[in-house]
Amino acid sequence: MKLYNYQLIIEYIGTNFVGWQIQKRGVSIQGEIQKVLRKFIKKDLKLLGSGRTDSGVHALGQSAHFIINHKIKPKKILKTLNHFLKKKGISILSIKNKKQDFHSRFSAKERKYLYVIINREAPLTLYRNKAWHIRNKLNFNLMKRGAKILEGKHNFSAYRSSSCGAKSPIRTLKKIQIK
């Protein structure tokens, strides 16, 4: 039986979610998308993401994939998914047919993160739930010096859980910008 592997690129506002991964309590991004996919495709499937996000974390382009035993029309399912997910703050940016060996997590070549800090006294309006609000004055020169120390290859063993499945604790931080 031939299997078809489909990649989704996903954007979401994570404020009202427990994170990416399905959990016993709370609503997850993975769970919401998987529910709509199963309803539309009428098959049991598992949506696998490129990584897990914590509660309240947003994504601009997270990769996920699922494998099924029949072809689908990506444009049609894209419209359907977005119709049912838009009210939840989830958008599917694209769906692509991939090779059998593609895996969202293990095929990823890099991950990009954006942390937004707004440094002012006034409360956040437009960036509420989308930025870290720091009222105390920040020392940007010191922050830039610290960022330079973090750039490069480092061993992150101290930050891993004992059940971490990653092959290596070594990671390379290519670029950190403080603006």
Each language-model region and where it sits:
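Structured-RNA-binding interfaces characteristic of tRNA pseudouridine synthases
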Residues: 1-179
